[in-house]
Amino acid sequence: MELEAILEGLDPQQREAVTNIRGPLCIIAGAGTGKTRVITHRIAYAVAAGVTDPSKTLALTFTARAAGEMRARLRTLGVPNATARTFHSAALKQLMYFWPYSFGGSFPKLLTSKGSFLGDAMGRSDTSLVPGVATLREISGEIEWAKSLQTAPSDYVEEALQSGRTLRIPNGRPDKENFAEIAKVYQAYETLKHQERIIDFEDVLLLTVGMLEEDRDVRERVRDQYRFFTVDEYQDVSPLQQRLLNGWLGNRDDICVVGDAAQTIYTFAGATSDFLLNFTHRYPKAEVVRLTRGYRSTPEIIETANRILKAGTSHNDHELTSMNERGEELELRSFSTQQSEVNAVVETIANLGKTHSDIAILARTNNQLDPFEAALKARSIETQLKNSERFFDRVDVRDAMRVIRSASVLPAEGGDWLHDLESVLRPFGNADYVRAFITLGKSMKEAGATSLRTLLRELEDRAEQNNPPTLPGVVLSTLHAAKGLEWDHVFLVGVNEGTLPMGNDVEEERRLFYVGLTRAKRTVHLSYSGAPSEFLSGLLASEAK
């Protein structure tokens, strides 16, 4: 593709970023400013200009969905061979390839879900913690946080106390006591993994780092493979991921980082915006380009989001300007009970007259979404549920996939593979994933798919890209899971004191609220029951209805 064709349709800020293809570059990209477009066009521009070869290019991001979108956009720009992966995916591919050379023997079993394995580890430790769902989720999160900071079990308690960690373990005990119990489970978990020759996703990063640092031959081969680096969502890297990036880079500086400190919402998981904020200290000759023109949201939404950040203590000076025409003012409604809030929101959605898949209900926690889901279903309104749990990691989804896989090797009864799909999924009831699988099957059959095996391959590809099949319904999502997504109409519910902000880090919760607001393109409906969140204080000119 010609250089000028790659630049077509870009605004001046985007052009500056895309054409800056030498040396270290830091792009500060606000919500809805065309970040992915800039990343992919910059890679395509560098390839077209002869600065890099597609096979020498590595683009890193944090979700398989985002990586898949990057690859698709690069293909349309004539760059089909550039590598776009998550940190974990890139590390796993290298680790599996070089394992026989660096470690010897067969590759260990990869633990894709910690739940049941943690339960086994708890049984082998002398912890007094009870392995309930909520407790296992907290322990899993703490282990992942500790390993992202490269903190051993023996150092976990001290690190957790110094970092001001808070827990939601339902046993009424002080966090300090629970930290000590988690340390026991953490040690038992690591011991059990070693005994059974199992590694988890954090180990993938740790082992790849160790391999690069200790094995000179592997290090040189990997560095020869990749020479042109791009890191998306750089505000969310952990110290372990930065160490891995250092191993890939060496002393070279052909790196472009893209991020927005105002959208740092994963410090609880070990992420830190320090690497983004200090990029020019590490690379004094680095260029910095700011993308401040917002193309997603209306001026009303952007102005409100800007005020949210200004009210904080982080002194974020990256203010966005909407490039869209003015629209509707944000709506703020108060309710005496959660149920009255649920009823009103669902009634509004039912009467909105908009495509349901263009509507999202966002909340701080999964539990807040349950009554909304029930109320929508009672009105026969389809829903899509998005949360921090990956769709294809769900036990029920994995069970359904196993059944489909078994059926795919058998000849279709009467030649009708779609009928077979419906038959094998019948025992799973009318769950959302069942309806999504069948809907996908119908659309694939209409497009010419000839076998259940074709559907299975599509589902496996989607699992690898974390791109689950969905139904065209109202999206129900936590604020964290909504990151990187957008809808025309957003209902931000349960904006109550004690829920948002939650925990001790008020500024991170402020950024989370900002992320929620900037998911909306056209309208935002804010609501709360009981005491309003401090974030709503003085937010809107008019009083709550």
What is each of the regions a protein language model found here?
Residues 31-39, 43, 284-287, 293-381, ...:
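Helicase P-loop NTPase motor core
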Residues 81-94, 379-403:
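Conserved beta-strand -> loop -> alpha-helix junction used to position metal-binding or nucleic-acid-contacting
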